[in-house]
Every structure is written in C-alpha cells, then in structure tokens.
A protein has these predicted regions:
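Catalytic palm active-site di-aspartate
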Residues: 101, 140-143, 159, 191-193, ...
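Catalytic palm subdomain of template-directed nucleic-acid polymerases
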Residues: 111, 230-248, 321-344, 464
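Short, conserved micro-motifs composed of acidic
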Residues: 337, 352-397
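Active-site palm subdomain of RNA-directed nucleic acid polymerases
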Residues: 175-191, 216, 293-323
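Basic, alpha-helical interaction scaffolds
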Residues: 390-460
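Basic/polar low-complexity segments
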Residues: 1-84, 374-387, 525-583
Length: 641
C-alpha cells in the first residue's frame, strides 16, 4: 500500500494513481453487482450496460426534424479563426491522464505531439466548420453511468456522462468561445452555471442576501425549489436551434455547424469495460462535452422572462428556484401564477418537472406569541398551499441548495453540523487507513484534500459568526494537526497549537474563512464579479469619516470586529475605501450575512492592502497581514526564548 501511495518522483508527494484509486472507490462511478430497471435485474457488466443504455434512451424527448432556415447572406459575421498557434496551445493544455474517447486517441499523444498535430488539425477543423460536416467518429460517445442519490441498484438514480473524442473537445472549445462571445451579453444575470466568473457561491450570495434583508425587515419569504426530470437529456434539438437563430441571432455557417453537431449522434454505455450496443441520441446535449453545458444554458435562459416583477429567480444550470416576499395574501397568489408560468414554459419547451421533488421553504422571522396562538386556533387559515400542474407542493423546513442547507430560519447550524460530521468521519478514515504514513508532507496533503476541503464549498455563504461554532470547527483541525505530526497523545495549549500551525503553513480555519470572504469582496468592490454591492452598502463620506468615534464592545453578543477600536478608527478616518451599512442589523440572519460581516473586516484592513492593483497582489498582501496578526504571539514568544 505504501508504494501505491508514494510518488516515485518524490516520496513526499502522493501518486496520481492513488488519487485515481481513491476516486474510483468513493462510489461515484462504481456500479453494484446487480442493478434493476423496473422489474428487470441484471448482474453482469454487459447486461447492465444494455439496461443503462435503455433507460438513458427512454429519457429522450421526441425526435427533431432539424428543419430550420439558414441565412448565409451575412456569413462573414460568423467566420472563426482556426489558427494553428491557438490549436497548438490547446493541445499543450490537454491533461495527459484524461480518459480517451471512442477513437482511443489518448491525451498524452496529443500533448506530446502538439507541435506536429497543430497545423493538420487546424486544416481539418476549418474544413469541417466551413462544410458543416463533423466526422462521424467525433459524434460517438462512450457513456459512463454516474450515481446521483438514492439506491445504487436502480439505474434511474444515475446520470449519463459522455466520454467523447479529445480532438473533438479541442474543436468544441474554439466553437464554444465564439458562441460565448456572441451570446454572453444577451444572457440573464441570474444564470450562474457553466459561465465564466460565476459559481455556486455567486448565486447563493445574492440569494441569501435577499432573504436575510427581508428577515431583517420582519418579512416572510417563500422559496420554491424546482426539480427537472433528466433536464440535459430532454433538450429538444429543434427548439434549441430555433432559439439560437431567433433569440441569439446565430445564423449562417455557425448555425449549420450546430445543426450537424446535434444530428446523428450515437452513444453506447460502458460498465466494467463492457460496451452496450450503439443507440441514436434523439435529444439532449451531451454531459461531459464542452459545448453541451453552454447549449443548455442558452436553451433555458428565457425561463427567466416568465416570472412576475417582484418574484426573483436564480439558476445554476438546471437547478432552479424562485422566491418572493410575502407581505399580503395576494403575494401568495402571484407566486402561484409564477409557478404556473414555469409549468407552461416546461410544457412548451418539452421539458418535465418532478412535482413530487419540488419543495417550498417558507423563511419567516421568529414567531410572535399572538401569531402562535392564532395558528393553534386556526391551523390552516393562514397557510397557502402551492401546486405544480395540479400536484400540491410539499412544505419543508430545509432544502439542500447547491450543496448548502437552507433552512426556514436562514440559520447555518444544520449546514455546520453536517460538515462537522462529514469532516470528522473522513479524518477518522484517514487515521485508520493511512496509519503507516510517516511523512508529514503526505499527511498534510491528505488532510487538505480530504478533510479541510469539506469546509471550502460556499464558505462565504454559511461562515459562522459564533465563536463557539468556530471552535467546534477548529477542533477538527486540531485533531488533524496531531495526526500529521504523530502527536496524538499530546495536549496543546493555544500557543503550542499556533506554533504547530505556523510550522505546517496552516491558518486557523476562522482566519482562513475570513480571508476567503475578503478575497471575494475585493472582486465585488472592484466590479470584477457578477455579484454587486447591495444598495445598502455605501462609501463613508469625508464628513462621516471625520465624525467616527470609537465603540467599546460591552455587548458579548456582538463580535469584536463589529466595534471600531481606536487603532482601526484612525485607519477608517483616512481611508476613502471605507464602507458603511445603512441597514441596522436586527436579525441574527442579517448579522451573519456576507455583506454585513465582511464590510467590518474590509474596514479593518490597512489601506495599502485594499489599494492593491491586482487580485494576486491583494491576496499576497492579505495573507502576509493575516499571518502576521495570527502568529504575532508566537513570534513574541520565540524572541523571548
């Protein structure tokens, strides 16, 4: 096992072979010995691959005609440069360990032969694009079933991931960049999936800020989560081609190419090396391709047009939610009208929702005694039941939203507890299975990749402000440090712990989270992010900065960073980049909101850090500042000794 883990080139590193093994044993791509589709069961790889292929084909929508008028009169507008230098650069970026597609041309060959292959490929790409004819082998996919959730025995709980030709992926990257350049400015801002500078974090930040602001004003918000049935596989080719032409003004050679890209595709499913028979792909965009995700985003974009003013919508690929402030009873009815409009959109676009999987989360301020009494006397009087296509939607207290648990109180206790449980479990697994490792560098790498990474996803959204919760999270890292240093029997005081963190080049997790907040806030402040500063965050005027007075924290419920101390006061008075929040925080949800808490941290930064010209320069200065602040006590102790 030791030789399997260690990298031959550097024993301090962990071999790629081991990471691949770890991924394969995590269950994402493993198929159990027996799978079923309805009442049919298969227990051999070939039979399983056929069963998976049948299920995936059953999800296709009606076949398309591909009958669309193409206008070549302005075709020079759609000319694409297939420069061999650009292709050579893309070839050199190919991951040599990437799985080969059906053509069995491996990434290592493309990377190592980039100089020789660049020019002939540029000729092939240009000829293929101009003629609107893609080689047949480039439109064949080996499909790998990847488990989503639910029983692993049921093929219905898997999604198809397509392994296509690596050469075709390079071709697609060039086309995708052109398509993105033409369409990006026409997309609604509320789509955050598969787009540059957008992510789960950017989507959830704007969403949670809207909910927290409403809670702070004692206003209820109803959130409706939608679940598409096999969204990527259901995209009708005629509809997406029509939208490309009419909505995004794609025409001529580029549209002709897209028609051929979607036409006559074939797939076979691979399970344990056994291939199913080939099947025609009647609809959908291939998951695992380069163009597929962008085509889906373009297909679903006009969904945003159907909701009412005052109702907000957010998308991450097919993950869709709408929400609305509920001030009066009519707001329920308007939200129901929006649900109806989205249902009609799905029918018109030949997509399907899973009504049983669509949920409603009502986010309300703390109940008042009088309201509680009223609910006991008239339990159904003030409840509006939403429905989707005649099916009543279920009300739930929490819903996992892009990997983050959103609750009816907009509190993050459930999210933190889930992460603590998972991180603790993974750390325990490391201790049991990697006990033979003696190298600190390897142990540290395992901790970062398998344990600490659990706290990285969307941390700017859910970061706890409570010291007690931060201490719970830090205990995980304390245990990890003992394991990394083989000091399980030791008990550290705070100073000893900080000394070990410094030696391992680690930060306390609270400071790491704050650093993540500030790095994102830098982008937002400098308009380098799709997220914008909310209207209640304003610059401090010169007069306001002069009138600043230090605050002494007499309230233990208010974190220290919300109180402006004397040394921070001097910085803020002279700093034109200081900001203020014009909303008085009344709710716990708003106090822990990203924008409110991060403004306090931002104002406390020295002006020379905030004025950094680039993101990399800001990161460098910020980390230096944070480390100096965190390890100041350690440095003083070392000097004394």
């Amino acid at each position: 096992m030791r030789t399997y883990v260690e990298d031959e080139s550097d024993p301090g590193l962990i071999s790629k072979k081991f990471w691949k093994y770890l991924k394969s044993t995590s269950g994402g791509t493993r198929v159990p010995e027996t799978v079923n589709y309805g009442s049919r069961f298969r227990n051999n790889p070939l039979g399983q691959s056929e069963l998976f292929n049948e299920f995936f084909c059953d999800q296709f929508s009606a076949a398309s005609t591909y009958d669309i008028d193409i206008d070549f009169s302005n075709d020079t507008d759609f000319d694409i440069d297939f420069n061999f230098r650009k292709i050579r650069k893309l070839l050199k970026l190919v991951n040599p360990n990437k799985a080969a597609g059906p053509d069995e041309i491996h990434g290592r060959i493309l990377k190592n032969c980039a100089v020789s292959l660049a020019y002939p490929l540029s000729v092939i790409f240009r000829t293929s694009y101009n003629s609107g004819m893609i080689p047949k082998d480039w439109k064949i996919a080996n499909v790998v079933p990847v488990h989503k959730k639910g029983s692993k025995m049921s093929v219905e709980n898997y999604r198809p991931i397509s392994l296509t030709s690596l050469i075709m992926k390079i071709f697609e990257k060039i086309i995708r960049d052109e398509l993105m350049w033409r369409c990006e400015n026409q997309l609604f801002n509320n789509q955050h999936g598969f787009l540059p500078n957008k992510s789960c974090t950017t989507q959830l930040l704007s969403f949670t800020d809207s909910i927290a602001t409403a809670l702070n004003a004692s206003t209820r918000t109803d959130i409706v989560y939608f679940d598409f049935a096999k969204a990527f596989d259901s995209v009708n080719h005629d509809i997406i081609l029509r939208k490309l032409k009419e909505r995004f003004k794609i025409d001529g050679t580029l549209l002709k190419f897209m028609v051929n890209y979607l036409q006559h595709r074939e797939q076979c499913v691979v399970v344990a090396g056994q291939k199913s028979s080939s099947a025609s792909v009647r609809s959908g965009v291939p998951q695992g391709s380069i163009l597929g995700p962008l085509l889906f985003v373009l297909f679903i974009d006009d969904m945003s047009e159907v909701v009412s003013e005052g109702t907000k919508i957010a998308l991450y690929a097919d993950d869709t939610k709408i929400w609305r402030k509920i001030n009066v009873w009519e707001d329920h009815e308007i939200l129901q009208q929006d649900i109806n409009a989205l249902h009609k959109w799905s029918i018109d676009n030949k997509m399907k929702f899973h009504p049983k999987k669509c949920k409603v989360v009502p986010v309300s301020p703390p109940d008042k005694a009088l309201q509680d009494l009223f609910n006991k006397i008239f339990p159904l009087r003030n409840i509006y039941f939403y429905n989707l296509g005649g099916v009543q939607l279920e009300f739930v207290k929490e819903e996992k939203d892009l990997g983050v648990i959103v609750t009816s109180k907009l509190s993050w206790e459930e999210q933190v507890e889930a992460l603590l449980s998972k991180a603790s479990s993974r750390l325990g697994l490391l201790k049991r299975t990697m006990h033979f490792l003696k190298c600190q560098k390897q142990r540290r790498a395992f901790y970062l990749a398998i344990v600490r990474s659990q706290f990285e996803h969307c941390v700017q959204v859910w970061r706890p402000s409570s010291d007690s919760v931060n201490q719970k999270i830090e205990r995980i890292q304390r245990r990890a440090v003992k394991w990394i240093l083989s000091e399980q029997d030791h008990s550290y005081n705070d100073l000893e712990y900080l000394m070990r963190l410094r030696d391992l080049d680690l930060l306390p997790l609270k400071e790491r989270f704050i650093t993540s907040d500030l790095l994102l806030f830098y982008d937002i402040y400098h308009n380098c992010s799709c997220v914008k500063l909310p209207p209640y965050i304003k610059p401090l005027t010169a007069d306001e900065r002069r009138r600043l007075r230090p605050k002494i924290n007499r309230n233990k419920n208010i974190p220290d960073n919300e109180c402006l101390s004397f040394h921070k006061l001097r910085e803020s008075r002279n700093d034109p980049m200081s900001l203020k929040c014009e909303i008085e925080p009344k709710s716990k949800a708003f106090k822990s909101n990203f924008f409110f808490r991060t403004v306090q941290e931002w104002n406390c930064l020295p002006s020379e850090i905030k004025e950094a010209a680039t993101k990399s320069n800001f990161r460098e200065k910020l980390l230096e500042h944070v480390k100096l602040k965190v390890f100041k006590t350690v440095a003083m102790e070392s000097n004394d000794s």
